[in-house]
Swiss-Prot record:
The lineage of its organism: Bacteria, Pseudomonadati, Campylobacterota, Epsilonproteobacteria, Campylobacterales. One of its GO terms (biological process) is bacterial-type flagellum assembly. GO terms for cellular component: cytoplasm. InterPro entries: Flagellar_assembly_factor_FliW (IPR003775), Flagellar_assmbl_FliW_dom_sf (IPR024046). Belongs to the FliW family. It comes from the Bacteria. This is Flagellar assembly factor FliW. It is found in: Cytoplasm. It comes from Sulfurimonas denitrificans (strain ATCC 33889 / DSM 1251).
Length: 126
């Protein structure tokens, strides 16, 4: 599924369109449509922890989100070996409106309870 990027991905401002591909129930791959060398592994944060935040009105307008919209929230993960060393960026979620194929990265306030590089091992069941 292709998405137009309405709010740039930090550090990748030239990425204007991405393709989202399911890997499994928790992970997805997001790749730049213009540059196959730019790709990210994304994770469903709700598979790991409680995760909630408000999407600002300005972002809702850009993505044309309303109360009926189907949205997908994913976070960038840096996969490591062993997998327990993988880190997740909970402070910069990707928001996808699957109704109109628009996407944005949202940067949460630094006062949030979420981190930029939290080890996945903190949330894996032992």
């Amino acid at each position: 599924m292709k998405f137009d990027v309405c709010v740039p991905i930090l550090g990748f401002e030239n990425v204007k369109e991405v393709t989202l591909e399911k890997i499994d129930d928790a992970f997805m791959r997001m790749e730049s449509s213009n540059d196959e060398h730019i790709s990210f592994t994304l994770i469903n944060p709700f598979a790991l922890r409680e995760y909630d935040f408000e999407i600002p009105d300005a972002t809702q307008k850009l993505l044309e989100i309303d109360e009926k919209s189907n949205i997908l929230i994913l976070n960038i993960a840096i996969i490591q070996t062993p997998v327990e060393d993988t880190v997740v960026n909970f402070i910069g979620p990707m928001i996808f409106n699957t109704d109109n194929n628009k996407a944005a990265q949202l940067v949460l306030s630094e006062s949030t309870k979420y981190g930029v590089a939290e080890k996945i091992s903190l949330y894996l069941k032992k």
